[in-house]
């Protein structure tokens, strides 16, 4: 007969909560794209959550790629409003979403950033680097990507 105290429970599943970066840097939808670029540089971020000016509620996301496309199209970032360039109603994941499932969402949707939602609303953001790092660390350690416990990445 086996001693019940000798049995080990499975490690907890690693979720986006383990790798996300709170707090999220936000910018208002009516600000200029140039202001978003400045905030990204200051916060060392590659994406910002866009909020509605009156309520502060998240309404979109703007990324480095969005800003690059505006500049490549000959637009002056100080003449373009964020709402004109942002992705409205971006795909989000729940705080309990596994890292593997987040990778699937990112791959199928070709997303580089995913806002993370909790019971109280927006709680963080994960990017493709966070997810890849966690998957690589899980692979190197020989564990499942769903059971890896990656180190917290540096804040953006």
PLM region spans:
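Tandem CBS (Cystathionine beta-synthase) repeat/Bateman regulatory domains
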Residues: 1-156
């Amino acid at each position: 007969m086996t001693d019940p105290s000798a049995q080990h429970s499975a490690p907890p599943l690693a979720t986006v909560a383990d790798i996300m970066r709170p707090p999220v840097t936000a910018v208002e939808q009516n600000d200029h794209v140039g202001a978003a670029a400045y905030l990204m540089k200051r916060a060392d971020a590659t994406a910002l959550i866009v909020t509605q000016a009156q309520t502060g509620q998240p309404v979109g996301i703007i990324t480095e790629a969005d800003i690059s496309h505006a500049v490549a199209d000959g637009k002056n970032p100080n003449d373009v409003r964020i709402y004109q360039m942002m992705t409205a109603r971006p795909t989000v994941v729940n705080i309990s979403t596994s890292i593997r499932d987040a990778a699937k969402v990112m791959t199928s949707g070709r997303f580089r950033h995913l806002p993370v939602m909790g019971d109280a609303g927006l709680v963080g953001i994960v990017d493709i680097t966070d997810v890849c790092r966690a998957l690589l660390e899980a692979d190197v350690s020989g564990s499942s990507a769903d059971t890896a416990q990656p180190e917290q990445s540096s804040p953006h």
